[in-house]
C-alpha cells in the first residue's frame, strides 16, 4: 500500500530562515554604520531587541508578511528614543524596506530547493507512486509566491494547503479519512511540525534545521515510536524501506 507524505515547506523543502538573517544583517549594517555611528548600541543588543520585538508581534500580527519589517521599524524607534536621537518618516520607511528584503523573489529563485529535495520528491512520485501533500504555514501571499517560484506544484498538484497556523486539528483535516499508519509528516520544527503531527496520530520524519527564536521556544524533541530523525531530506529516498 502506498504512503502519504505531508511536507512542510519553509526550511524543509526550501531555505527560509537565512532570508530573514540576510535582512537582519543589512539592518544592523544600516543602523550601526549609516544612521547611528558612533552612538550605535552593541550589535548583540540590537539583534536581541529586534528578536524580542518580533516575537511579541507574532502574538498580534501572526505570521503576516507585514510583521517582520514592522519589527524593524519598532526596533529602530526604540533605539532612537533610548539614545535621544531624532528619527523621521524616511528612516522608518527605510527600516521597513530593509525588512522586506526577507521576501525577495530573486533570492528564492537563486536558492531554490534544499539539496536532495528534487531527487527525493521525484523518487516518491515516480518510483514509489506515493501521494504527496504540501502543508505550509505563513502569509498566504508570500507562500503562494514561494511555491510558484520553486515550481513545487509539479509534485503536489492541487494538494497544497497554506494555513496561518499549524496544529493537530489542521493536520487531521488534511489527513481526512486516510489510514494514519500510512501517513508521514516531514518537517524541521518541533513546535510547528513534530508536536502537532504526533498529537494528530500520524508518523513524523524530523529533519533538524536552524529555526528562528519563536520556533525554538519548544525545541525539545519528544521520544515517540512514531518519530524518525533524519539529518537530510535525501535520507527519505535512501532509507525508504525503513519507513514502516
Labelled PLM ranges:
Residues 20-29, 69, 73, 77, ...:
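An amphipathic alpha-helix signature
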Residues 1-3, 118, 122, 138-244:
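Asp-based, Mg2+/Mn2+-dependent phosphohydrolase catalytic module
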Residues 90-150, 161-162:
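Substrate-recognition element of Asp-dependent hydrolases with the DxDx(T/V) motif
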Residues 51-105:
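A metal-dependent, Asp-based hydrolase signature
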Residues 20-21, 39, 43, 62-69, ...:
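Alpha-helix N-cap/helix-initiation sites
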Residues 1-48:
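Active-site neighborhood of HAD-like aspartate-dependent phosphohydrolases
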Residues 33-50, 81-96, 154-159:
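Short, surface-exposed acidic
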Amino acid at each position: 500500500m502506498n504512503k502519504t507524505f505531508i511536507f512542510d515547506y519553509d526550511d524543509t523543502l526550501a531555505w527560509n530562515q537565512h532570508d530573514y538573517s540576510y535582512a537582519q544583517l543589512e539592518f544592523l549594517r544600516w543602523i550601526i554604520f549609516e544612521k547611528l555611528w558612533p552612538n550605535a548600541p552593541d550589535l548583540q543588543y540590537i539583534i536581541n531587541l529586534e528578536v524580542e520585538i518580533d516575537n511579541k508581534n507574532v502574538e498580534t500580527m501572526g505570521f503576516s508578511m507585514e510583521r517582520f519589517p514592522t519589527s524593524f521599524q519598532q526596533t529602530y524607534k526604540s533605539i532612537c528614543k533610548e539614545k535621544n536621537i531624532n528619527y523621521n518618516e524616511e528612516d522608518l520607511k527605510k527600516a521597513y524596506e530593509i525588512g522586506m528584503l526577507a521576501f525577495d523573489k530573486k533570492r528564492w529563485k537563486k536558492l531554490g530547493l534544499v539539496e536532495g529535495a528534487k531527487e527525493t520528491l521525484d523518487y516518491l512520485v515516480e518510483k514509489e507512486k506515493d501521494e504527496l501533500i504540501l502543508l505550509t504555514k505563513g502569509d498566504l501571499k508570500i507562500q503562494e509566491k514561494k511555491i510558484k517560484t520553486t515550481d513545487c506544484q509539479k509534485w503536489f498538484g492541487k494538494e497544497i494547503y497554506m494555513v496561518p497556523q499549524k496544529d493537530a486539528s489542521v493536520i487531521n483535516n488534511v489527513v481526512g479519512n486516510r489510514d494514519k499508519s500510512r501517513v508521514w509528516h516531514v518537517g524541521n520544527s518541533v513546535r510547528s511540525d513534530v508536536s502537532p503531527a504526533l498529537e494528530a496520530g500520524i508518523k513524523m520524519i524530523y529533519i533538524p534545521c536552524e529555526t528562528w527564536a519563536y520556533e525554538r521556544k519548544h525545541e525539545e524533541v519528544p521520544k515517540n515510536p512514531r518519530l524518525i530523525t533524519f539529518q537530510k531530506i535525501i535520507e527519505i529516498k535512501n532509507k525508504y524501506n525503513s519507513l514502516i
